[in-house]
Every structure is written in C-alpha cells, then in structure tokens.
C-alpha cells in the first residue's frame, strides 16, 4: 500500500474513533460526578457531563480543585462522557 493510502486509512480510523459515541459501560466513572466549581474564585467557563440529562452542560469553574468531570470544551466532554 502506498504512503498516501496509509495516510488516508489512518485519517479515516482517527475520524471514526472521534465520532464513535462512548457507551455507558465504557464511560469513565468520573462522568457521574456533579459539577464542582472548586474553592477558588476564578470565573472560567467549563463543561461537565450531566448523567441524568445525558448531555454536556456549561458551568463556572473557579480555577482550582473541583473534580475530574470538568472539561475545557464541550467537544472534549462529549468525546469523553456523552453516549
């Protein structure tokens, strides 16, 4: 297979991996944690996975501590937690 063909195959596999939803059994446990702004007083837009609504939602993060259910972008949240 040519290098162009290998690059195309690699690109398609990467795209498939990005677009394949996470099943609930593969979802990390931290996706079930509530949004946690932490004790600091920053005003940073962040996203968390809301397990009841099964969506990623925005919240205000204080900038320190909190928990692992905290993402800089909604796309990162969806890739990690959304089914």
UniProtKB/Swiss-Prot annotation:
It comes from the Eukaryota. GO terms for cellular component: extracellular region. GO terms for molecular function: serine-type endopeptidase inhibitor activity. Pfam families: Kunitz_BPTI. Residues 1-24 form the signal peptide. Its main location: secreted. Gene3D superfamilies: Pancreatic trypsin inhibitor Kunitz domain. It is found in: Secreted. Keywords: Disulfide bond, Protease inhibitor, Secreted, Serine protease inhibitor, Signal. The record marks 41-42 as: Reactive bond for trypsin. Disulfide bonds join 31-81, 40-64, 56-77. InterPro entries: Kunitz_BPTI, Kunitz_BPTI_sf, Prtase_inh_Kunz-CS, TFPI/VKTCI-like. CDD domains: Kunitz_textilinin-like. Residues 31-81 form the BPTI/Kunitz inhibitor domain. Serine protease inhibitor. This is Tigerin-4. It comes from Notechis scutatus scutatus.
């Amino acid at each position: 297979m040519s290098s162009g063909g290998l690059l195309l195959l690699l690109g398609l596999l990467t795209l498939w991996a990005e677009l394949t939803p996470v099943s609930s059994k593969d979802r990390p446990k931290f996706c079930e944690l509530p949004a946690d702004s932490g004790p600091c007083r920053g005003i940073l837009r962040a996203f968390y996975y809301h397990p009841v609504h099964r969506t990623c939602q925005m919240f205000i993060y204080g900038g320190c501590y909190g928990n692992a259910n905290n993402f800089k972008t909604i796309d990162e949240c969806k890739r990690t937690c959304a089914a």
